[in-house]
Swiss-Prot record:
Pfam families: PPIase_AIP
One Gene Ontology CC term in the entry: cytosol
Main location: cytoplasm
Lineage: Eukaryota, Metazoa, Chordata, Craniata, Vertebrata
GO MF annotations, alphabetized: aryl hydrocarbon receptor binding; GAF domain binding; peptidyl-prolyl cis-trans isomerase activity; transcription coregulator activity; unfolded protein binding
InterPro entries for this protein: AIP/AIPL1/TTC9, PPIase_AIP, PPIase_dom_sf, TPR-like_helical_dom_sf, TPR_rpt
Signal peptide: none
Residues where Phosphoserine is found: 43
Subunit structure: Interacts with RET in the pituitary gland; this interaction prevents the formation of the AIP-survivin complex.
TPR repeats by residue range: 179-212, 231-264, 265-298
Known role: May play a positive role in AHR-mediated (aromatic hydrocarbon receptor) signaling, possibly by influencing its receptivity for ligand and/or its nuclear targeting.
Organism name: Mus musculus
Name of the protein described by the UniProt record: AH receptor-interacting protein
Keyword annotations of the record: Cytoplasm, Phosphoprotein, Repeat, TPR repeat
Gene symbol of the encoding locus: Aip
One BP term from GO: xenobiotic metabolic process
Length: 330
């Protein structure tokens, strides 16, 4: 360990172990997954916090050998055991791109595109342009780089092949191969009644395909082929949201499908159910009528939905009348 720390120091990285880890130091071969919490701090006397993964509810995951945009993180985590807590003071040369990486991580935490504002422009060029990153603290750090301290708590180290990669960590080829597998896992979970978990699987599969689709010209044959793969996954996701009673999300997604594919029976049916659930009776009836127009064989199912809607409306009308009678009787 002393030799390791000495080599880090020669490269402009000072390591201070706060809590010893467990077992032997992993070999960290390519494909190893390190899961850790981090805090990024200014290196001045105040040591104020710039970013803290614990405030985002999810630890950082790094795959060794995937050319993470902040190479120093791979360097330092590869010196740590599971359970270890350490601080690393890193020279400017190692952290000049931190503002860009931090922006991406913040976007991910907020559910945004991690590449928002960074397309078609390399990191170094952006640094020279001094374009705003949308965060005052990162803008200041970009314009006046300084050494940074990374406080790392290593939670888990997993060898290649012992874990399922997150979509963001996959190559394009890995994403394409993973989609059918993730799709089937989602179907299995849904059949077993694990609706929330199934929705997460469908979401991951959609994320893989959306990432691939972003690299294609909109409307091109490859783009359309990917979109045709996304649609059934999105419909499955909507089914999960119907069960979870998240009706407005169903309305949004089904409408987006129908804007492109106006003959999609399943999208009309699910949107009709969502409209019915939020008391949009006319819209529900219109969607169910479209279902019958496109597939008359579904008449029994549609009739059942319409009867259920009529019953709910009648009950609601009776409840409203009773409520109004109570108001005016006082």
């Amino acid at each position: 360990m002393a030799d390791l720390i000495a080599r880090l120091r020669e490269d402009g990285i000072q390591k201070r172990v706060i809590q010893e880890g467990r077992g032997e130091l992993p070999d960290f071969q390519d494909g190893t997954k390190a899961t850790f919490h981090f805090r990024t701090l200014h290196s001045d006397n105040e040591g104020s916090v710039i970013d803290d993964s614990r405030t985002r509810g999810k630890p950082m995951e790094l795959i060794v050998g995937k050319k993470f945009k902040l190479p120093v993180w791979e360097t330092i985590v590869c010196t740590m055991r599971e359970g270890e807590i350490a601080q690393f003071l890193c020279d400017i040369k190692h952290v000049v791109l931190y503002p860009l990486v931090a922006k991406s991580l913040r976007n991910i935490a907020e559910g945004k595109d991690p590449l928002e504002g960074q397309r078609h422009c390399c990191g170094i060029a952006q640094m020279h342009e001094h374009s705003s990153l949308g965060h005052a603290d990162l803008d200041a750090l970009q314009q006046n780089p300084q050494p940074l301290i990374f406080h790392i708590e290593m939670l888990k180290v997993e060898s290649p092949g012992t874990y399922q990669q997150d979509p963001w960590a996959m190559t394009d080829e890995e994403k394409a191969k993973a989609v059918p597998v993730i799709h089937q896992e989602g179907n299995r979970l849904y059949r077993e009644g694990q609706v929330k978990e199934a929705a997460a699987k469908y979401y991951d599969a959609i994320a893989c395909l959306k990432n691939l689709q972003m690299k294609e010209q909109p409307g091109s044959p490859d783009w359309i082929q990917l979109d045709l793969q996304i649609t059934p996954l999105l419909l499955n996701y909507c089914q999960c949201k119907l069960v979870a009673q998240e009706y407005y999300e169903v309305l949004d997604h089904c409408s987006s499908i129908l804007n492109k594919y106006d003959d999609n029976v399943k999208a009309y049916f699910k949107r009709g159910k969502a409209h019915a659930a939020v008391w949009n009776a006319q819209e529900a009836q219109a969607d169910f009528a479209k279902v019958l127009e496109l597939d008359p064989a579904l008449a029994p199912v549609v009739s059942r939905e319409l009867r259920a809607l009529e019953t709910r409306i009648r009950q609601k009308d009776e409840e409203d009348k009773a409520r109004f009678r109570g108001i005016f009787s006082h």
